Amino acid sequence: MTIKYLKEHLLEFPEIILKKAIAIYVYGSVARNDSDNDSDCDLLVCVDDCSEAEFLLLKSSVSSWEKNFNCEFAFYRMSTLKEMQKKGSYFLWHIKQEGVLLYEQSSAFQELLFQLPSYTGTKSDFLEYSEILDDINKSVLQDNTTIEYDLSVLAVLARNICIGCCYLLGNMDFGRKSPVIKCINFWGAKFPFSLSEYEKLYDFRLAITRGKEINKDLVTEEYIACWLKKIHSTLSLALSLCEVI
């Protein structure tokens, strides 16, 4: 999927989407022009406030695009986006930083992005990730049948922590690998894992989202225990960064 293809085929979107959407953006790897075989196409659809029934109808109307083109649609009402904007939402910074506008009936969302304040919840996010790590640790001790899923969650945490660190360092990056690379470059030998180790871990996330085959030999209590320690160490670095920035 490419931006060019999306723009050329935009009118093939369901009529209800084109009628109700305030704006449609592509973001993520397609917008960055660094997609690969493991990438999907992320699309944001901003709509006016509507009933829950109408909102569900909008979401269900794109099922063929999701199935046939590996598209993932994020639908948001403007009232929700306005509340997110007040807090300087990471997601909205993601759109502002790299989103590409495909379709627009009103400039309301662009104006909202123009006034987007700085995000101040990074430390709170890191503390929440610490709680998730504790939950995973308890889960593994109680039931080792969820290791593959737990590893996929750890992959998301690894990525999100690195995204948060890049934000704190004033170098926003929402990619799959690039935030990790930047953190490795920043901390050097202090950083708990290598890019290749992270890529193997992230395969567990792709196994859930894209059906990618994984190395079953890695599905062990020892492997996840090792990653729990690595993510804890990464969080310690991230929290120390919060204290100096």
Question: What residue spans do the PLM features occupy?
Answer:
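Catalytic core of pol beta-like nucleotidyltransferases
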Residues: M1-I16, K20, A31-N37, E52-I245
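Short hydrophobic/aromatic beta-strand micro-patches
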Residues: L44-D48
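Hydrophobic/anchoring residues in structured secondary elements
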Residues: A23-V26
